[in-house]
């Protein structure tokens, strides 16, 4: 998924927020066998550009700050996706197509419970969400996140 903006609370705990635009991403739904049934792991990897930073913190180009922002944004996205999945399970609807992933991965098992997927299985199916977020640039906020070749040469000298 790309082209949308993620806004999370300020990582320093104060007032304000940080916003990032997703420039590229990939989502994988991985069915697995767990405790005698089907479970899923949703893996999301995204590259983002910081578009707004309303927090008191060091420049985003510093590695520690960038890593902290990546963790905060990843955590926020993980919670939102997990909440969406919980809502769909409570509503007994499968708009993402988890059932189709289960059918492809475990066709014989799925055939035995296909008619009951929505009622009995999907609402109780464990789903783990993992997010890996990488900040590529800070846009106009503080300049590039990664040091330029010139900056690297200056550090070495």
Regions found by a protein language model. Give the residues of each.
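Membrane-proximal alpha-helical signals and transmembrane carboxylates
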Residues: 1-157
């Amino acid at each position: 998924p790309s082209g949308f903006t993620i806004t999370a609370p300020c990582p320093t705990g104060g007032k304000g927020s940080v916003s990032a635009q997703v420039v590229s991403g990939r989502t994988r739904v991985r069915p697995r066998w767990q405790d005698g049934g089907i479970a899923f792991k949703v893996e999301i990897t995204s590259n983002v550009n910081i578009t707004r930073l309303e927090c008191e913190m060091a420049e985003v180009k510093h590695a520690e700050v960038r890593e902290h922002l990546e963790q905060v944004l990843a955590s926020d996205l993980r919670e939102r996706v997990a909440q969406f999945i919980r809502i769909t399970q409570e509503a007994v609807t499968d708009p993402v197509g988890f059932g189709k992933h289960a059918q492809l991965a475990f066709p014989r098992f799925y055939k035995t419970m296909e008619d009951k997927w929505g009622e009995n299985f999907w609402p109780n199916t464990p789903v783990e969400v993992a997010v890996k977020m990488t900040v590529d640039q800070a846009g106009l906020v503080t300049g590039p996140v990664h040091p330029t070749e010139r900056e690297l040469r200056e550090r070495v000298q």
